[in-house]
Amino acid sequence: LIEGDILVYADMARWEIQQRFRRKELDNWGVGNFDEDVLKKYKRAFFIEWRVLDRHKKGLFEKMDYLLDTNIKNDPKMVKGDAFRAALTQAVNQPFRLVPFFDPGVWGGQWKKVV
């Protein structure tokens, strides 16, 4: 392979991918299954695609010149790779809190129901 002069890593959060699956705006990688059941698309992404792509992403992390955030449709944001890595370094060296969410669709969520 020929390496380019600049590496732009385009990123989309898994939550946004799930939302686009639901709206039939996104298919699984190279499959063209826009109209397939959302749960099947999500499980394929969760168990196959995201595992493979996470490994690939690790090799690109130190090399990327820019990170392109594609989470807001038609409104991408871009930051220099060095600035992104510096922000991550700062984030992991101070307390932070993740915001939990519950998505009942994929794994059932029956235990949350009041019987």
What are the residue ranges of the model-derived segments?
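Contiguous ligand/interfacial binding patches
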Residues: 26-40
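Conserved nucleotide-sensing/catalytic segment adjacent to the nucleotide-binding pocket
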Residues: 1
